[in-house]
From Swiss-Prot:
Mg(2+) 2 binds at residues 180, 216, 220. The gene is ilvC. It comes from Xanthomonas campestris pv. campestris (strain ATCC 33913 / DSM 3586 / NCPPB 528 / LMG 568 / P 25). Keywords: Amino-acid biosynthesis, Branched-chain amino acid biosynthesis, Magnesium, Metal-binding, NADP, Oxidoreductase. The active site is at 97. Signal peptide: none annotated. Involved in the biosynthesis of branched-chain amino acids (BCAA). Catalyzes an alkyl-migration followed by a ketol-acid reduction of (S)-2-acetolactate (S2AL) to yield (R)-2,3-dihydroxy-isovalerate. In the isomerase reaction, S2AL is rearranged via a Mg-dependent methyl migration to produce 3-hydroxy-3-methyl-2-ketobutyrate (HMKB). In the reductase reaction, this 2-ketoacid undergoes a metal-dependent reduction by NADPH to yield (R)-2,3-dihydroxy-isovalerate. Mg(2+) 1 binds at residues 180, 184. Residues 172-317 form the KARI C-terminal knotted domain. This is Ketol-acid reductoisomerase (NADP(+)). InterPro entries: 6-PGluconate_DH-like_C_sf, KARI, KARI_C, KARI_N, KARI_prok, NAD(P)-bd_dom_sf. NADP(+) binds at residues 14-17, 37, 42, 72-75, 123. Its cofactor is Mg(2+). Residues 1-171 form the KARI N-terminal Rossmann domain.
Length: 333
């Protein structure tokens, strides 16, 4: 490190997380450079935010800590062709997700410290909480400690993001990677979206209006999730009617039963043994044919057209939709 507490930092990537990390770290007093390919989609944004923007190969040459905040599937090539040949001896390589390292797609140089720092929230929230004097909890891990200071690198970085204002929990690359993938696939994204689509289909096929079905299985879900977020399942149960509580108790286990849990275990096994990652890499390298097909099927699901029409009448959503759309357009460095 340049000194005991303030490493010079290169942020590679300027999407949702990259921008939040760079801004928070700079406001915490760190010397931050942003590494982006010249003419890339986020170069102008980083420059407008006041950062020195250089090519990734240049950014990593003098940095004490290099944070790789690009999409998972571009990281291997980026590391092999740009980072590894140029990163200075004894520096720290940081990731926000352990996929590439845990599954040996990236094999870090032996002289480097290798750590993980993952805020448990989207980039916009990481930035917003920091600006109002709070923070988003962070988890961190050490994969390779060559200098003996790798853990301090991770804690210093997490603190610079504002994580110490909330909570910082130690994990491992294995645990972070496998639990993150499982949460996305079985519950947060795959599980929730499939449950909503199935509920919508059941009601519409039974003759109920699609608009009513949309409100009941998708729109009102936010109200429930907000209560989960604030105080767990028990808080949600405190704020719904006794009828809803009873329905939860007797019907929830009929929908999510032992067979569902067994299939969730199968999903976890595929994650743990590398099957999911192997398939995802093959899909990406083949040009995303199945990914494109699956995505189109979701876009064409009847709930999307119904929702689009109903949301157009919810004028209070306009600002939220614009804010939510921005990070999705900033995925590539």
């Amino acid at each position: 490190m340049s000194n005991d507490t303030q490493p010079t930092i290169a942020i590679i990537g300027y999407g949702s997380q990259g921008r939040a990390h760079a801004l928070n770290l700079r406001d915490s007093g760190f010397d931050v450079t942003v590494g982006l390919r010249p003419g890339g989609p986020t170069e102008a944004k980083a420059q407008a935010d006041g950062f020195t923007v250089v090519a990734p190969a240049e950014a990593v040459k003098t940095a004490d800590l290099v944070a790789v905040l690009t999409p998972d599937m571009v990281q291997k090539k980026l590391y092999e062709e740009v980072i590894a040949p140029n990163m200075k001896q004894g520096a720290c390589l940081l990731f926000a997700h352990g996929l590439n390292v845990h599954f040996d797609m990236i094999k870090p140089r032996a002289d480097l410290d290798v750590v993980l720092v993952a805020p448990k929230g989207p980039g916009a929230l990481v930035r917003r909480e920091y600006e109002i004097g709070r923070g988003v909890p962070c988890i961190y891990a050490v994969y390779q400690d060559t200098s003996g200071k790798a853990e301090q690198f991770a804690l210093t970085y997490a603190g610079g993001l504002g994580g110490a204002r909330a909570n910082i929990i130690k994990t491992t690359f294995k645990e972070e990677t496998e639990t993150d993938l499982f949460g996305e696939q079985a519950v947060l994204c795959g599980g929730a979206s499939s449950l909503v689509q199935a509920g919508f289909e059941v009601l519409v096929e039974a003759g109920y209006q699609p608009e009513i079905a949309y409100y009941e299985v998708l729109h009102e879900l936010k109200l429930i999730v907000d209560l989960f977020y604030e105080g767990g399942i028990t808080r949600m149960l405190e704020f719904v009617s006794e009828t809803a509580q009873y329905g939860d108790y007797v019907s929830g286990p009929r929908v999510i039963d032992a067979s569902t849990k067994a299939r969730m275990k199968d999903v976890l096994t595929d994650i743990q043994n590398g099957t999911f990652t192997k398939n995802w890499v093959a899909e990406y390298e083949a040009g995303l044919p199945n990914y494109t097909k699956f995505k189109q099927a979701d876009l064409e699901h009847p709930i999307e057209e119904v929702g689009k029409k109903l949301r157009a009448k919810m004028v209070w959503l306009n600002g939220e939709q614009q804010a939510a759309a921005t990070p999705a357009k900033q995925q590539a460095a």
